Amino acid sequence: MARPFPLERVRNIGIAAHIDAGKTTTTERILFYSGVVHKIGEVHDGAAVTDWMAQERERGITITAAAISTSWQDHRINIIDTPGHVDFTIEVERSMRVLDGVIAVFCAVGGVQPQSETVWRQADRYSVPRMVFVNKMDRTGADFLKVYGQIKDRLKANAAPIQLPIGAEGDLSGIIDLVANKAYIYKNDLGTDIEESDIPADMASEAAEWRAKLMETVAETDEELIEQFLENGELTEQQLKKGIREGVLKHGLVPLLCGSAFKNKGVQLVLDAVVDYLPAPVDVPPIQGVLPNGEEAVRPSDDSEPFSALAFKVMADPYGKLTFVRMYSGVLEKGSYVTNSTKDIKERISRLVVLKADDREEVDQLRAGDLGAVLGLKNTTTGDTLCTTDEPIVLETLFIPEPVISVAVEPKTKGDMEKLSKALVSLAEEDPTFRVSTDQETNQTVIAGMGELHLEILVDRMLREFKVEANIGAPQVSYRETIRSSSKGEGKFARQTGGKGQYGHVVIEMEPGEPGTGFEFVNKIVGGVVPKEYIGPASNGMKETCESGVLAGYPLIDVKVTMVDGSFHDVDSSEMAFKIAGSMAFKDGVKKCNPVLLEPMMKVEVETPEDFLGSIIGDLSSRRGQVEGQSIDDGQSKVQAKVPLAEMFGYATQLRSMTQGRGIFSMEFSNYEEVPRNVAEAIISKNQGNS
């Protein structure tokens, strides 16, 4: 079957930005002008095509990366609309991994905002060529050139305006195309009646100045163009287009466009620029991977190459599990068997679909360069490679950040227990940043994610999609107890109730153990003062007491106990009596050994613009944190600190507030350390009050 579009005429692009810059509205207009939809859907009305989840339509934000196919000027354009909220970073991350080009949308009023920097860094990580659409030029305070300056200064981008707005705020009437040296005036509200004309006289000199700057910038991308520019003093429209495209593909040049998606101005020119300047799959370097023998290999984007694809998203669907794939090489046929080389298993392809948000078109095959979805994959998850069985390869996978916040979830009824289990498995399959674990001590189910909004949305989905009723609480910190000195302990259990009595007597020496040893027991009973059959029960009594602690009910760790003496009764002694005596001796010993409470310390790394460094360090200190290192590179500060886990709840929200959303942090367990006396007293008293 022939390709509907040659590979050179395919564009896989993402639309990414800070929350509220107008990404989804821009996508909606692209679909309207390219004929996918015949009525414009607005985000604030809850009618956007790409916002297909109930939560997205209610909140007016995009949570999941919706994939849509459309066409423009005889080119196939596959678009992914990504979320701008920092809690959904994984959605942006997975989009960047499978795209060839990005339209970064900036607000003409807000300019370079926090999440824009995060998205820009993600695009840098995967070397994705990009262009910028400065949106919302109709808003009060809109300033195209101010945003241009911020992109150059804050993102260190080699940005070049290829358009200028005619008017701004309420007077935005058209756009100057500096490449074609023409003006486009919008004659109706829908943006479908556009008049091409000469540049307005009052803007002619400004446009000429910016066009000259553009020529100079573009000429620097190519030696041949430099010669042409020096020889003729200018470049033709075709030379400019060629130079801009070369500059974008070499990741050096970022063309700037402007308009207002909401007011239907400038979107068709954005589509023209996607076709003219963003890369086709054949323009980007071949995907890299590893062969079974460990050798590195590449797969060029070509239908005749062996089949390889990356699963970049898994989604529960009324018709079954949808696995989104980016085709890198070869052809994938409906009904075929493929290998998941990441897990070394075979999978069957039941059906193939191309998506238009929540609408879908079934196809018989997907080809190199396509974005599509597969039904029928049972064990494939995000980041897995699918390939031909004859020539396996494992492609570079996704960078998946560690979750930073966790809460406990408790089903309200027994009936909810099973539903909760199914919901958690399904949600964890879809979202690799969502983790589920069981706290062995509290027996609570703990869910972890990228932020409070992330977990809020997931809990909301449990309720709506899986009909689970659950109580959501704050997670409990897993404290520990230990001892700081040595002493003796003694326990004597003697009971006489009529007939046979109970008797057990144990004497122990107790001392701090080596870090990481937990509970260590040594038997030094000599001369049969305690028969062998009672040693084990005595040790078990101590171990059980160790597990439930003495101070505040937390496990006692790193303690060495030596049983040195004791006594027994021929008739009344029993295993139970010695188990109780062992426990009594252990409690007696701990009280004399300076017991202390330990808390989990976390290694925390915060990355933030330099301006916020003082606030970050002050806040970490107020959380009982110890700053262990800091560095500044290119205006970005990094702070390494050790902070008690108990003080880190709510930190994601606090950091966002302190840094206007521009700070990011990672956190992992480091070790246990002693809790300061005043804090320990409060914890002990609270726990003793609860018991």
UniProtKB/Swiss-Prot annotation:
Residue ranges crossing the lipid bilayer per the database entry: none
Example of a GO cellular component annotation carried by this entry: cytoplasm
Subcellular location as annotated: Cytoplasm
InterPro entries attached to this UniProt entry: EFG_II (IPR041095), EFG_III (IPR009022), EFG_III/V (IPR035647), EFG_IV (IPR047872), EFG_V (IPR035649), EFG_V-like (IPR000640), EFTu-like_2 (IPR004161), G_TR_CS (IPR031157)
Pfam families for the chain: EFG_C, EFG_III, EFG_IV, GTP_EFTU, GTP_EFTU_D2
tr-type G domain ranges (all copies): 8-282
The keyword Kinase appears for this protein: no
Binding site for GTP: 17-24, 81-85, 135-138
One GO MF term: GTPase activity
UniProt keyword terms in alphabetical order: Cytoplasm, Elongation factor, GTP-binding, Nucleotide-binding, Protein biosynthesis
GO BP terms in the entry: ribosome disassembly
Predominant location: cytoplasm
Stated role: Catalyzes the GTP-dependent ribosomal translocation step during translation elongation. During this step, the ribosome changes from the pre-translocational (PRE) to the post-translocational (POST) state as the newly formed A-site-bound peptidyl-tRNA and P-site-bound deacylated tRNA move to the P and E sites, respectively. Catalyzes the coordinated movement of the two tRNA molecules, the mRNA and conformational changes in the ribosome.
Family: Belongs to the TRAFAC class translation factor GTPase superfamily. Classic translation factor GTPase family. EF-G/EF-2 subfamily.
PANTHER family: RIBOSOME-RELEASING FACTOR 2, MITOCHONDRIAL, TRANSLATION ELONGATION FACTOR G-RELATED
Protein name: Elongation factor G
Species this protein is from: Prochlorococcus marinus (strain MIT 9211)
Gene: fusA
